[in-house]
């Protein structure tokens, strides 16, 4: 239930798991940060926006072994409601998984999202929308995005797809992100 949260002008290096995880936040700003994670670490996400509203991420540089920026609604935090009114702008990202991801954990609504003026370089997958659970994804705009993908290895998620979209249901009993 944090309101008016600001994370600005910091550098974080070599996070072993999700670096910044906003849960149930309202009116958050992440601006001018650098996240320099090891590109060989799985699940080393950069920024995860989870059940949060009115979030702006701007002017960031993110290197991550997993998702650089991920919007989601995880089951264990459903009391915080949906993820909506998100703006990501002027960011540069490199990932061995998916630089920009919506899902795959989505038990609620992800709505009114803008990704604008971003560069994705040397990533195994550029943009991914993985709506594998009962939630919905709507009103998402990608504008002025440069995507440069490279295939790295079968051990990483993705095969150098600039854009990947799936609504294939998660396996019964599997509630883990994949």
Regions found by a protein language model. Give the residues of each.
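Extracellular/periplasmic carbohydrate-active domains that bind, remodel
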Residues: 1-178
């Amino acid at each position: 239930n944090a309101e008016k949260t600001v994370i600005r002008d910091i550098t974080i290096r070599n996070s072993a798991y999700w670096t910044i995880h906003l849960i149930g936040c309202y009116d958050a700003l992440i601006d001018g940060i650098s996240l320099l994670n090891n590109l060989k670490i799985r699940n080393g996400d950069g920024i995860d926006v989870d059940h949060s509203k009115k979030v702006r991420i701007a002017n960031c540089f993110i290197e991550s072994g997993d998702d650089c920026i991920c919007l989601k609604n995880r089951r264990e935090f459903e009391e915080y409601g949906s993820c909506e009114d998100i703006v990501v702008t002027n960011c540069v990202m490199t990932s061995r998984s998916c630089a920009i991801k919506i899902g795959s954990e989505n038990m609620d609504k992800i709505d009114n999202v803008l990704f604008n003026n971003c560069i994705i370089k040397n990533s195994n997958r550029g943009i991914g929308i993985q709506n594998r659970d009962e939630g919905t994804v709507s009103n998402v705009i990608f504008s002025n995005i440069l995507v440069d993908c490279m295939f790295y290895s079968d051990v990483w998620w993705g095969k150098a797809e600039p854009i990947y979209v799936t609504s294939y249901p998660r396996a019964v009993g599997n509630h883990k992100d994949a």
